[in-house]
């Protein structure tokens, strides 16, 4: 029943964005891309060491409608934000004040670097993905833009090429890391499955998720995230530097999942950094354990991996905060002593705010939402909860 209502809601959103596009520009869309949001269940910090990431596409989507222009101008209209931008292929440099439009510019530049000839486009964007919650809105927009450009200006554009184009946009023009797990997840996802990103092989693999009798809840802590990017980036950089020191030893394995904590005793780094790198080593092993548990349909084993991961992120990697820990603790209060470890919860993303996810039994969903009323009384602002499902990946209509 929930799937039916979600499908109906998606159809209504598409009708709305198509109608607004025609009203804004006077022409009908020639291509429409629908891209899901995503959240990471485990391993989102392991890309630099060629580890694995386990992610899930969700049924909250970004829709992009486009129609061709006869000039080189790109007109962008965000229905979600009520904002308009006008850019030209002659001037696509990054400008801080352009904010979300920089994602579009980066993908256009990446296409041009690939030798594609582009004309201008009229673009209308409607995003249902909660903003500023770490659920992949910027990369959803980039993937959507790459898909519609491919539909209109490339004879064929396989998904692997879309991955390369968006990664190039991120690394060269937005000066971030590739965000490979984000891109592969939303491109290759299937309803009812998680996506494992193998950063070493640059591949995605589906892993069925047993959702019967369960509810998946994302809870946005609404903690102001102005410190999250800077603090998380600095912390991860120190871990990358420590890992690079380990790799200088020719006897050390290349993949983090094969790196033993004992190897870190041989390098000269502060104890805090050593502790965080060891937590990432354990996280990498945990991803493999979680996937094996899902394949065996052993949700109790999967839940144990998830709950221990949050403990490591809180105590060893130190990227949690009181608000996130409170949300996780409320979810875990529904663990049944007679059937332990069938409820799990963890922060997802950069930490220092953002979201938690919880996988609850059907009967625990409404009581969990009721407990969120206490959150505002304790912290002074409301949390926002979203029930989600494993979604299909991106598509072009």
From Swiss-Prot:
Site (Transition state stabilizer): 38
Keyword Signal among record annotations: no
Active site as annotated: 182 (proton acceptor)
Matching InterPro entries: GalKase_N (IPR019539), GHMP_kinase_C_dom (IPR013750), GHMP_kinase_C_sf (IPR036554), GHMP_kinase_N_dom (IPR006204), Mevalonate/galactokinase (IPR006206), Ribosomal_Su5_D2-typ_SF (IPR020568), Ribsml_uS5_D2-typ_fold_subgr (IPR014721)
Main enzyme class: transferase
Binding residues annotated for ATP, in chain numbering: 78
CC terms in the record's Gene Ontology section: cytosol
GO biological processes: galactose metabolic process
Pathway(s) of this molecule: Carbohydrate metabolism; galactose metabolism
EC annotation from Swiss-Prot or TrEMBL: 2.7.1.6
Keywords assigned by UniProt, alphabetized: ATP-binding, Carbohydrate metabolism, Cytoplasm, Galactose metabolism, Kinase, Magnesium, Metal-binding, Nucleotide-binding, Transferase
Superkingdom of the source species: Bacteria
Reactions mediated catalytically: alpha-D-galactose + ATP = alpha-D-galactose 1-phosphate + ADP + H(+)
Compartment(s): Cytoplasm
MF terms (GO), sorted A to Z: ATP binding; galactokinase activity; metal ion binding
Similarity comment: Belongs to the GHMP kinase family. GalK subfamily.
Function: Catalyzes the transfer of the gamma-phosphate of ATP to D-galactose to form alpha-D-galactose-1-phosphate (Gal-1-P).
Protein name per the record: Putative galactokinase
């Amino acid at each position: 029943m929930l799937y039916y209502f979600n499908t109906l809601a998606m159809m209504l959103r598409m009708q709305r964005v198509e109608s607004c596009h025609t009203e804004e520009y006077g022409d009908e869309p020639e291509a429409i891309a629908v891209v899901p949001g995503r959240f990471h269940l485990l391993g989102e910090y392991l890309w630099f060491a060629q580890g694995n990431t386990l992610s899930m596409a969700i049924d909250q989507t970004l829709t992009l409608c486009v129609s061709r222009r006869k000039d080189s101008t790109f007109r962008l209209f965000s229905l979600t934000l009520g904002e308009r931008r006008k850019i030209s292929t002659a001037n696509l440099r990054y400008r801080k004040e352009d904010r979300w439009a920089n994602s579009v510019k980066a993908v256009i530049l990446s296409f041009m670097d690939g030798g594609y000839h582009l004309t201008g486009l009229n673009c209308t964007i409607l995003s249902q993905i909660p903003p500023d919650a770490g659920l992949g809105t910027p990369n959803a927009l980039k993937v959507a833009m790459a898909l519609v450009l491919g539909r209109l200006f490339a004879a064929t554009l396989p998904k692997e090429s879309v991955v390369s184009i968006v990664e190039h946009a991120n690394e060269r023009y937005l000066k971030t890391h590739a965000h490979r797990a984000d891109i592969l997840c939303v491109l290759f996802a299937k309803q009812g499955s998680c996506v494992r990103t193998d950063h070493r092989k640059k591949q995605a693999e589906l892993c069925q998720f047993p959702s019967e009798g369960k509810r998946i809840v994302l809870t946005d802590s609404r903690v102001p995230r102005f410190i999250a990017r800077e603090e998380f980036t600095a912390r991860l950089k120190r871990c990358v530097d420590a890992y690079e020191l380990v790799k200088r030893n020719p006897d050390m394995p290349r993949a983090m999942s094969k790196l033993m904590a004992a190897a870190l005793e041989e390098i000269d780094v502060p104890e805090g950094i050593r502790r965080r790198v060891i937590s990432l080593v354990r996280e990498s092993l945990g991803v493999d354990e979680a996937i094996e548990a899902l394949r065996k349909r052993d949700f109790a084993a999967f839940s144990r991996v998830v709950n221990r991961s949050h403990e490591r992120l809180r105590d060893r990697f130190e990227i949690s905060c009181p608000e996130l820990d409170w949300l996780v603790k409320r979810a875990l209060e529904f663990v049944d002593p007679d059937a332990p470890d069938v409820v799990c919860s963890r922060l997802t993303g950069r930490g220092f705010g953002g979201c938690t996810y919880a996988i609850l039994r059907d009967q625990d969903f409404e009581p969990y939402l009721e407990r969120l009323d206490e959150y505002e009384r304790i912290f002074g602002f409301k949390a926002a909860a979203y029930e989600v499902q494993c979604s299909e990946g991106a598509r072009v209509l």
